[in-house]
Amino acid sequence: MERLLSCAGTGTLYLKVTIATLPDDTLLDIFDFHVRNTYIGGPHGWPTLVHVCQRWRNLVYASPRRLDLQLCCTQKTPARKMLDIWPALPIIIDSGHSVDQVSPAEGADNVMAALEHHGRVRVISLDKGVSSPLLRRIASTLQEPFPELKEVWFNSASSDGSAPALPDSFLASAPRLELLRLDSIPFPALGKLLFSASHLVYLYLEGIPHSGYISPEAMVSGLSALPGLKSFILEFHSPRSRPDQIIQHPSSTRVLLPALTYFRFKGVGEYLEDLTAQIDAPQLCDIGIMFFNQLIFGTSHLLKFIARIERLKALSRAEVVFSPDFVQLRLAPRAQPGPSNDARLSLSTSCRESDWQLSSVTQFCTSSLPSLPTLESLYVSEHRPTKLPHGLDDIEKAQWIEALHPFTAVKDLHLTRELVVRVLGALQELPWEGGTNMLPALQSLFIEGFEPSESLQESITQFVTARQLAGHPVALHHWKREIW
């Protein structure tokens, strides 16, 4: 042990010094680094330190706050035995990495044994899938006071909406709660909890079953009690979860979310319209929205909501991504260091048909987003297992023209090989005057790959020549597809 825990100087001026001669403060710095870089409660965490020698043991136990000492109980941890042996430290209840190594009954008993220590439980993270029977037992217990509880994460083992609903008084006595994450678990009385959880910073509601539907009005009412909320995810399981009617809300009644910087939504446009009509989030800089399959959706309130966010007014790059199951429009600032470089905005629709996807892009640009005067780079890419047919009918040509029309400030257009013929073919159908009104600021065309096929080369040549003759020359470049 001494050989492993020693360090020798160089030359004859330095004597050999063992770690035992280091002062307590230095040892604590080393211990702190060790504890924060190892899995809590694992074999290489702080329990290893207390078995080295009596001095280390005393030093560790005398510094529980400095070292943030915690006990980790998993479903395979014999909680009653372990908690009787170790000091009365804060408890983390975690799914662990090998849930299948214990029977469901034994795992449930271990979790419930740890929950008996109401005043010590700090984190409950059961993200590997909680069975309905265990969820009922936990939910019943969590109606009791848990004064130190800060984080709760439950992921239902059933993603079909069959998980039991959480009771009205769930977590009603957890005043220090900072993070709540529920996946595929209905909680119709969420609004009641939010009024008592004023310290909540992270609220993640994913895969919300229809049985757990929360109206936009109830959601906004609950959010009004969370001035420190920084991250918010609201994702419904199906398009069945929608408001019965859109209510007109006067702008003077909007709820301010001053700390919110991250927002994710999945659902129908009507719900998002009702929600964004009632809130303001001036610091928001990362938005991700996924609509269920909707060909027509009005999002005027979403447009106004985005327009009120200062950090989203300087987005200079856009990418349209066509995938097998969805289409996505992503916007970001120019890739350069700076405090505003973390701004992100993405709009997606879950649909498969290419004409529906093109229509969605048009609606994103015309109905959901304010004008884009700072958008100078446009990337259009396709990620499909099968290629689109080579033919380009009149309907698709018109859809491409309509989808590209809002990008009036774009100087650089990047196209993947799969889309060159389709995009340039559509633009070439326009008369000379109309053709230059499309992408009027375009200066450079970037084509993926270095050896375009004969058909690609023909489309490229015709487009570049047409722009040259119209007095709007375009430089041709090759590029390698980037990952944002």
What are these regions (language model features)?
Residues 1-484:
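Leucine-rich repeat
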